Amino acid sequence: MNKKLFIFGLSLFLFLFIFNLSLSLKLSSKNNFYNHNHINNQIHRNNEGNNKLSKLIHLHNDVIDTTISNRDNILFNKKSLNQKSKGSLFLVHLNGPIEKQVHNELIKQLDQLFNGGEIIHYIPDNTYLISMIGSDNNDNNNNNKIELINRLKELIPSIQWLKPLEPRLKISPLFKQNQFQGDNQNEIDQLRIYYHENSNQQSNDIDNIISESSLTLVEKELISNNNNNNNNVLITVNLKNSKLSLESIIYKISTRSLVYWIEPSSSKLIKHTPSNKFAHYSIQSGSASTTSTPIWDVIGIKGDGEIVGCADTGIDINHCFFYDTNPIGSTHRKIISYSSGNGDQIDEIDGHGTHIVGTIIGSTTVDPSVSEFSGGAPNSKVAFVDLQVGSGNGLSIQSNLTAIYQSTYDQNAKVHCDAWNSNIGPFYTGVTEMIDRFQWDHPDFLVVRSAGNNVNFGFNSIYTLSQESTSKNSLVVGSSNQPSSTYLSSIDYWDWDFIYNSIRTSVCTQGQSIYGITCSDVPTQTTSVDIQTQCCSNPILAKICCSTEIQQQYQTNSTVYSEFIPSLFSGVGPTSDGRLKPDLLAPGSPIISSRSLGPSSTINHCSPITSGIATSALIAMEGSSQAAAVATSAAVLVRQYYRDGYFINGKVNSSVGFQPSASLVKATLINTASINVDSTLEYSQGFGNIQLSKLITTTNAQTTSLDIPSSIEKADPIINTGETNSYCFSLDSKADIDITLVWTDPAGSPLSTFTLVNNLDLALLAFVDGELSIYSGNSETIFKNTSQVIFDQLNNVEVIRIKDAPIGSYDVKIFGTNIVIPNQSYSVVIRTSGGTTLMKESECAQCFYDPNDDQSQMCEFDNGIGTQYCKDDNRFSKCVVYECNTGYVFDNGITKSCVTTLALTLYDIVLLGIFGIIIVGAVIFVLVCYKSKSLDQNKYFSLSKDKGGDGNSIRSNSVAGNNNNNNNNNNNNNNNNNNNNNNNNNNNNNNNNNSNGKQSNIELNSVGGGDDGTPNGDDQQQQNNSPQYDEDGRLISGQEVEISIFEVISLGKPESKILGLALFLSFIDVALGLAVPLVAANIFDYLYAGETGKISTTILTFALIIIGMIIVQFLSGILLALAGHRIIARLRREMFASLLKQDMAFFNERKTGELMSRLASDVSSVRSIISDSIPHMIIQIATIGGTLIMLFIISWKLSLVVLCPLPILLVFSKFYGGYIEVISVKVQDALADAATHAAETLFNMKTVRWFSAEEREVAKFSKLISVSYKIALKMTIWNGIYSSTSGIFEQLSVFILLWYGSSLVSNGDLTPSMLIAFNLFLPFITGAVTQVASLYTTYKSYKGSSYRFFEIMQRVPDIQGEGGITRTKVRGDIQFNKVSFAYSSNPDQLVLEKIDIKFEPGTITALIGPSGGGKSTMLSLIGRLYNIDGGSITLDGTNIKDFNVPNLHEHISIVNQEPSLFSGSIAENIMFGKPTATRSEIIEACKQANAHDFITAMPEGYDTLIGERGTALSGGQKQRIAIARTIIKNPTVLLLDETTSELDVESEKLVQDSIDKLVVGRTVIIVAHRLTTILTADIIAVVSDSTISEMGTPEELLAKKGMFYDFVQIQYGKQGEELDIQLPSNSRNTRNADKLRNRSETIKQIAKINNIIPIHRPQRGDDDNEDDENNSGQGSSRSPPPMWRQAKKNANVNKSMLLTRRNTHVQHQSSSGGWQKGNVDDKLQRVLQKSRKKGFMNNQDHKDIKATLVLY
């Protein structure tokens, strides 16, 4: 019970341990397993950095730590909502990264719960600005909103933090900049107000504030329309007439619930100002000095079919670059639309717009000399928006820039050029948000924007980007210089007057500070003021507008005027959030292009260039605007490159062409760029200068390869959070690698410090020479460790460039790190160049094989997820199940898949059934086919008959002791005195004799007993052979004993059906039990998955299984118990029958108590083996088999490791079982000795009581019991050692499970639920193995204790009980023919030697002689209780060996000296002679036996119970009943063995009378010593010294004066004197009882007349000195000793006969001679008792008799 509690507690602990472990594993599963591969996982989220960063909300006016602020998270009430602007707009922070389904669910719930609530902006990190606007703002609505917010939290558990947007967070940081501080604060004359409008909550409150604050509404524009109910609106208001301070106005507006952003604006300070023969060479060939245009000339791309959008000052449509006779529209050569706010279609003189558009698309058909200065995309057209309000007034940009883009986009313009900027920067403002929003909404629309010209924005920074140029999605271009030769060529194309006047306007009119120039330095141009003179006279102006000074600078200052150097005026990044801007550089100084002549331009004006003199149709300009125009033309060429399919092989292939996205165009331009010079400003060059020639596949014998994933589906790939896309290639030669990733990012929020919304990451994995190198986007670091990779978290452009990349495999990885707005598209361009071969597409390396790192990844599996492991080819192995879905478990057997618990249980039952069928089949085979040696009845029919009659029969040794007197001894007794005898003693006697002389045998008290030695019928010729032993080393009667498992099982054959059914039910119980861990694992899965509703159903299944197990266990237990009871009853019956079939030698060798112990305890042991040990062992083996199946299905690795201690336990159990088997035999033998002693004591209880020997007997019994106790104590100690050792092995297995199993779970090799199941299965197998080991030792113990059972059951008696001839009647003619016989205990000492005697029918033959002479043995041989060693015994001439033994016994009967009665009634004892006898026959027999009278005198008469062994009767009564039993049998041959020797005179007379009646007409053989019995015989045979020394009638023998004569002298006390005895005639005709008795009376009368001769006493009690006390010196005068004594003395010459009863002490004749057996006093007491009964001596004569016997 304690063990079960311990296992249950341990299992519960492990369950909780694994449950907590699995929860932590679930939370970190993305760190342990991989969506695509191990390396992906390691580098995928390194850019997130510290987890704390993902908990921050980055706002311009605050950084909110949600882990600190969440203590009052969503603590909304009426008061707080009123205080927080009624709570219309909220910031909601979620646990990141944010997955697609979370985002979609948030949108859905906002719309449903808040009547059209929506996401307005994303704010890093993981935060959304959302609207939750109700129908009104009353108290009831606020209370309802609290409930809805809490409901939202419940529906979206990933919400970590949620609070209203506070007013302080809505104010732009521009208000704090220098340009709007101090005196300039008054220059803020406008505010831009962004608010969210809902149909349920209009902007009435804002309108009210405008009215109350005396603000003037300048403009109200819809900047985004998210759905039918919600809009984001921009309001621009004028502050000129307001009576309130700026701070008050801002505060009042910020408190409005609908407002989310406020920015400053100023009509005075904020200006939108505009910020190419040689440029063509630069962007196409990479250098202006290389006068080639391969994009135009080699592959023929000039922008055909492309439309460019542009918004600028206007276009001189009469210029030859644009002129067409067709009206502006789709048929116009260059301009398909012209939108002008003023309604004109002209540009100012030297207008910026004309120059920009000419740089992009300008081309002429009039003058070839001018065509050299055509635009970069000369075959393209333009959709133009005129932004100029008036000459010299700059640009008029409407508040909503998206309207500009929409107008050009509607004309199918996909590239738009903005060559202007405001002087606000470099913050991400509402203006920037609009630019990015439009491109997000139109992903094929690319805005190319100038980086701006260097302007001091009023803060201390070298970064000079404008708010527009901080746009993420726009291609922002900075200006780079062209070669000095280009500068010199452009000197005549500068409009110096225009430059001078522009400076004067900026300084004098607009008040701008330019290099410290004052208004007096730039007087108005007049006839008296020459601009060149004015410019050249001023050292500052000389560097700006003095042509000679500038020409000299062009020639001498190579530091500044060199190719690729960023222009000094070009805007420099980064942006305020640290992003890289500008993206690219393009030639912007100088650019010669079309010149506007203003309103006075003439049609198609385009004067030629003659003799190097500049034409008035062209003008040189510089600025980032010109660079933007050049880059725009390059973008147009790239679009055609993809649209017409040039990207495949440089030729038109429209079938593969597609419309590229803006991000692909941008990525391609950046991919071709290169940084050609070093710069002191880190962010000044972006990603370098454009070089489109890199797109050409073959140039100058170098090979360029492009991989454009967007071209596969003709659309950009899509990615979401947690996803990874891979593009892989290999290099066969060294080459340069350029990889560019660009995505159009959702618009950022002006509220946030950081603008990146969707975070993608680029990585390149290089596998070169077995080493892994990792490159990340925008990083120059090469990472070797995946955990150290750092990613760019700011830019939506990422670039990897590798110079001279070595041969190897390369995998490009695009990670969806945190896609907060789902379905982000992206573009990636992969280009290799410089190698001799093309890059080859290859299979992506799914992992990087590292022998020291077991890499794995998750994979899809039916009804579950799996894992894969990295192989040496950098590919993952086959998907192996890691975890099954809820309700499924993994079958690691045949199916290798996730199956239902029921299916796996059935599968296990099937396997277990097959296993059970094999086992049960083997058992049935044994039961049916194996022939049990123990139960085989044929063994009694297969005996070979003795070879009698020739004296040469073969005797086989079957002794349990020593075979001769010279063998070495093995003393296994408890004797206190050692002897020198060579006998093997197995007794507990304390006295040993040192004599080797012949031993005289005591007469057996019953037939087959006596003192002739232990009988044996084995052959004599093999008497010296080595003894035979069984498989365990035990000697067994010369016969092999089978105790194999098959023999044991076969004993249960009659109960095989019951046992088979019990085993079948037990197998069902095992199968049901094996389902329990699986059900428990299923419960764990449901608990783990949170599906608690299904747990109750599973628990019900669990309960049904338990109930089924209880029922099955009950039934199988009943059947096993029933089988056990039937087995024990049957085996006791079988054993008893086997005992009764044994020959008398068997019984002589064993004690009755021992046999009773075997019949009781040994049979119980066998029953325990058959019905307990073996079935339970089979059940436990089945449990082991089924459990092993399940354990190896779950995890073969864990199974092998956990079960490794068990073989040690099994080996230990094997040796321990063998030891227990041996020691169990000793215990059983010791208990048998004790039982034997107890049986003997109880059998002789009267003697014990008379001698008051109770304490002595108890002491002896205690001593014997202590022997078994000591042995059992030793066995108990070993049992304890074994139990503790086996327990240690069990706990060791549990420890290994905890250690190794947890590591397998953490490594993904094992699911948590399966580890739980494994833990629950482990006690099954450890318990079963322990049980098997215990049952094995129990089996060995029972086997040892049941050894004697099998010895008895399998012992084949030497005398065949079955078969042989049968006769219904015999004459009774018995003849001994040279019969020799020796007992098996002393085969060297013949008891009978060549005996020849004949017993004729109708005669009485008396056998007399010294005790131990062989008289009783002869009777036993006649009844064939033993086999003779030589000669033959015949009955009616037929050898008795040929007789059927039971039939032989039907003709022979015996009456023993001590009759054997049974504890039944008198009638039952008499019927033992004839079971079919009637009551009348019984009465008649009793009358003849003189027993009727005393029987009828008893209360119950013949039905009187006489008690055990007839204890209720006297000796004479028992003898007469025995005679009656013989009379009723009516035998032909009657054997009488001292029938009256123990009776008193009266009883003797009655018995003798009954004998006289019995002997008439039969062959009678009498063994007797009383003359009254002997003298009735016809023939007397004296048996002495193993032979018949005398034989004849009594008269003849008396006349011979031989041994019979001496016998008579002893009885009459006339030793040494002549007896004159007259015997009556004893003829057959005159003989009667009276005459026969007269013989005795005559002898007695003669003996009484003579005096008794004095007895000669010896000098020593143990001496045979023949001198008596009175005549010690006259020995010669003594009469010679009688022949009787001489015969005994002659017998001393022979070797002593050994008694073979194992526990009988044997004494030998002393060295001085004489014959005696046992204690002399005991013998004399017996002799005197007999003498008194015979009447030969009175009580006074007993001393003389004693002296005489001692003398002999």
UniProtKB/Swiss-Prot annotation:
ATP binds at G1409, P1410, S1411, G1412, G1413, G1414, K1415, S1416. Its EC number is 3.4.21.-. InterPro entries: AAA+_ATPase (IPR003593), ABC1_TM_dom (IPR011527), ABC1_TM_sf (IPR036640), ABC_transporter-like_ATP-bd (IPR003439), ABC_transporter-like_CS (IPR017871), Galactose-bd-like_sf (IPR008979), P-loop_NTPase (IPR027417), Peptidase_S8/S53_dom (IPR000209). Residues 1-24 form the signal peptide. Residues 995-1004 have a biased composition (Polar residues). Residues 280-696 form the Peptidase S8 domain. Induction: Down-regulated by phagocytic stimuli (when grown on E.coli). GO terms for molecular function: ABC-type transporter activity; ATP binding; ATP hydrolysis activity; ATPase-coupled transmembrane transporter activity; serine-type endopeptidase activity; serine-type peptidase activity. Residues 962-994, 1013-1028 have a biased composition (Low complexity). The active site is at D312 (charge relay system), H352 (charge relay system), S625 (charge relay system). This is Serine protease/ABC transporter B family protein tagA. It comes from Dictyostelium discoideum (Social amoeba). The lineage of its organism: Eukaryota, Amoebozoa, Evosea, Eumycetozoa, Dictyostelia.
